[in-house]
């Protein structure tokens, strides 16, 4: 079977699937992505691309995401055209097209079915736009968000089928597309993600926690409102007051992956540390951890 994976941040959601497909010598697996020199998957041929340019600074700001998606889509088209000229025609195209890479693949491979990862469809109402600010969106925000969906609608139209991890994510999409989207969770590698009775975590202060301790954990790539960090920190204050033996361990970075930076420019972690009153002897923070270390944090956790 010939399989084409598409994701700008290889392997994205396809870490396990690409590995399994690549391990079968009967398969020919290609993965197109932005330059990722350190990422290699045995049996998978990685093909890198770079966007030819950035959006024009003079473009209407509503159109910036769409313009950027078009440039990425053009480069993905060029890469796939070279693959096709070399004889590679996939039996299936599997990708997360939320950045534009899938926009023109049907023009290269009109007969190859496309399976798209439908992560999110934006809405100004009852969704993510202002949920933690407790206010109505402005008319400008409504227009910007509606326009941002332009190329996502193209993806929904051109994909033969879509998958999304949760019913919440499905319900963000227009109802007319529900029949072509399956709710399918990313899954868990149950051979790797397992309990470990002797798991232990050495904290930044040098002390050690194990599964015998009362531990609550929070793990996120970045500490930000979109990932529930503000809510968690306010809950942490209550937990530490009501559970005198409890330790809280958090893992994550200070960047912003979704939404906006704090108006002050400070990391949300610093802002929340000023707001809440925590027993710092029982509140422990790690930055980003290697995967095996992060698993040990989860293994000692009573509640996450």
Go through the PLM ranges and name each one.
Residues 81-99, 105, 113-115:
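Short N-terminal targeting/anchoring amphipathic segment
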Residues 38-64:
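Conserved nucleotide-sugar phosphate-binding/catalytic loop shared by glycosyltransferases and other
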Residues 53-63, 111-150, 191-196, 200-202, ...:
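Acceptor-binding helix/loop patch of EC 2.4 sugar-transfer enzymes
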Residues 202-227, 233-238, 248-249:
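Conserved donor-binding/catalytic core segment of Leloir-type glycosyltransferases
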Residues 160, 299-304:
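Acidic donor-binding loop of glycosyltransferase active sites
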Residues 1-45, 163:
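N-terminal subdomain of nucleotide-sugar transferases
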Residues 168, 187:
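Carbohydrate-associated surface elements
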Residues 252, 256, 261-296:
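Nucleotide-activated donor-binding/catalytic signature segment of Leloir-type glycosyltransferases, i.e.
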